[in-house]
Amino acid sequence: GATGSLFGMPYGSETSVLGYRKDIFEKHGLEVPQNYDELLALACQIPELEPGMGGLASRAASGHHAAHAFLLHLNPLGGAIFDESWEPVVNNAAGVKAAEALKTIVDCGAEGSVNFGFGEALGSFLNGDTAMFLDTTIVAGQVDNPDKSKVVGNVGWALHPMGTKRASQTGGFGIGIPANAENKDAAFLLMQWLTSKEGDKLVAMAGGNPSRFSTHADADVNAKFPHMATFGEALQYADPDWRPIIPVWGKINADLGTTLSKVLTEDLDIQEALDGVAARARTVMDEAGYYTWNE
């Protein structure tokens, strides 16, 4: 458009949910964690009950993966990167608690957890090396695929555990029409069909991620994929602001991720680490002109 803004239709909505090994939980009489205290306790209890098995698979590799994992916990624990005036608050008590949670999870994880990206964390869960997985809903299809998973039929799904509030990440994809498209009318009709109730249900029945709440609640969909009702409930708590969508976020995110990696691998003091992230983030924001209203 004239403003250069981007618009699109949601397609394949995702959020964070907790996958857990039903067989392991039943074997040891464990309850599905409802809050972070229970989650962290289980993450470190399971390796004691099942030697060689990690508690909770998590991203942790330096950069984007460590930052993503931190943000996954920051929001439910009541934290944020910025306050309403765009002042960094990542180093407040909630931020420290989120970093402590991530370190506990990684320390009690499977061998090599500190270097896990998304693929490695998922692989650890699919291979049966870890008892829990807290990340995106898009993995459900792989969990149920015998060609990719050793835990088919042994995984249950639950809402992202409560922190100070019920919250989960927001992800997914979108579809739009390029300004220079030659067949805009045809493209619009295709978008209309793909995002329709019929199209959304076809996606779900094929094992994909639907976008409509009605699809998540559909009887046919749930008969084939019983987890869909839980995923639909989880989407109601998905926070679109779980990470700042601003032009300079990439730079701040990279710094956050590399700094957190030092917390995980070098035992850098958490408060010191987050104080540094906050100070550098403010410099980036200042240089980008975010505080001109204060001048």
Predicted regions and their residues:
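Periplasmic solute-binding protein
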Residues: 1-32, 59-84, 169-178, 236, ...
